[in-house]
UniProtKB/Swiss-Prot annotation:
NCBIfam families: rpsB_bact
GO biological process terms held by the UniProt record: mitochondrial translation
Gene that this sequence comes from: mrp4
Annotated source species: Schizosaccharomyces pombe (strain 972 / ATCC 24843)
Protein name, per record: Small ribosomal subunit protein uS2m
Lineage: Eukaryota, Fungi, Dikarya, Ascomycota, Taphrinomycotina
Chief location bin: mitochondrion
Annotated PROSITE patterns: RIBOSOMAL_S2_1 (PS00962)
Annotated GO MF terms: structural constituent of ribosome; tRNA binding
Length: 263
C-alpha cells in the first residue's frame, strides 16, 4: 500500500510498529535531517558535494517569467515552469568563494554576514561568531558604508574604559569605524543598497544569486536557491567554517612557535 493512501493516524501507527520491530533486532531508526544541524555544526569544505547541494534544494530556481538573462550561464534547464540551476556551476563558484573567505581569514580580515529574510537570523549570527566577524539580520541602514560618519553620529554611542578600580567610565573619545574586508550577503535582492555601497567603497562581496537576480550586483556570485533556508544555512555554514579553520590553524601555529623568555 502506498503512503499517500494512508491516513495520518495510520502513518503514525506504522512508524511505531516499525520502531518496535527494529528495537527487537538492535537497530534504531535515526532521523535523516535536523533543521538546526547546518547551523550548529555545518559541514566542512571537504564534505562539499553535489548530493549535499541537491538535498538542500540549491538547484531550484524561480519562474521562467521573472528570469534574469545574466544568469543564463548558471541555468541547466527548465522543468514545470521554473529554471533549474546547474549544480556543477554552483560547485565551481562556491569553491571560489571558499577560497576568497580563506584568504581573508588568513590575513585576519573582517567578515560581515548579512541575511535579512525571515529565518536567516540564527544562521547569520552563528556564522559571524564562527568567523569572528559581524552580522546584520534586521535591515541595512542606508549610508552605512558611503556615509559612515553621519550614520554613526545619528546612532550615537560612546567608548567605555575601566578605571584603576575596574569600574567602567565613559571617555570623551568618539567611536571610530572600520570597513569590512568582505561582505557575505545571503539575499542580495533585498539588500541592493548594501551591494551598491560596497561597490562604491571597493569592499568585495559574496552573494547567493538566484535566477531572478543580477550576478553583477556582487563581486563573487554563488548561483543557488536563495529562497531555501536549508540552502542559505548550508552556504553560510560552509563559508564560516572555512574562516574558523584558518583561525584554528593560526592558533596552532602560535602555540607551536611561542617561546618563553629566560628569567
Amino acid at each position: 500500500m502506498l503512503s499517500r493512501k494512508l491516513s495520518p493516524e495510520q502513518l503514525v501507527a506504522r512508524r511505531l510498529k516499525i520502531r518496535d520491530w527494529n528495537h527487537k533486532i538492535g537497530a534504531v531508526v535515526a532521523p535523516h535531517y535536523s533543521p538546526t544541524l547546518s547551523i550548529r555544526n555545518p559541514a566542512p569544505p571537504s564534505q562539499l558535494s553535489l548530493p549535499l547541494l541537491l538535498s538542500s534544494g540549491a538547484h531550484l530556481g524561480h519562474s521562467t517569467s521573472i528570469w534574469n538573462p545574466y544568469t543564463q550561464p548558471f541555468i541547466y534547464g527548465k522543468r514545470e515552469g521554473i529554471h533549474i540551476i546547474s549544480l556543477d556551476q554552483t560547485m565551481v563558484y562556491l569553491r571560489r568563494a571558499i577560497s576568497v573567505v580563506r584568504s581573508i581569514a588568513k590575513e585576519n580580515g573582517i567578515i560581515l554576514f548579512i541575511g535579512t529574510r525571515n529565518g536567516q537570523k540564527d544562521s547569520v549570527v552563528a556564522a559571524a561568531k564562527r568567523a569572528r566577524g559581524y552580522h546584520i539580520f534586521d535591515r541595512w541602514l542606508p549610508g552605512l558604508l558611503t556615509n559612515a560618519r553621519e550614520v554613526q553620529g545619528k546612532l550615537g554611542g560612546s567608548i567605555l574604559c575601566k578605571d584603576n578600580r575596574g569600574k567602567l567610565i565613559q571617555t570623551d573619545k568618539k567611536p571610530s569605524y572600520v570597513f569590512p574586508d568582505l561582505m557575505v550577503i545571503l539575499n542580495p535582492l533585498e539588500n541592493k543598497s548594501a551591494c551598491l555601497e560596497a561597490q562604491k567603497t571597493h569592499v568585495p562581496t559574496i552573494g547567493i544569486i538566484d535566477t531572478d537576480a543580477d550576478p553583477r550586483m556582487v563581486t563573487y556570485p554563488i548561483p543557488a536557491n536563495d529562497d531555501s533556508l536549508r540552502c542559505t544555512d548550508l552556504i553560510a555554514g560552509l563559508l564560516s567554517r572555512v574562516a574558523e579553520q584558518e583561525y584554528q590553524k593560526a592558533n596552532q601555529a602560535f602555540e607551536k612557535d611561542k617561546f618563553t623568555l629566560p628569567l
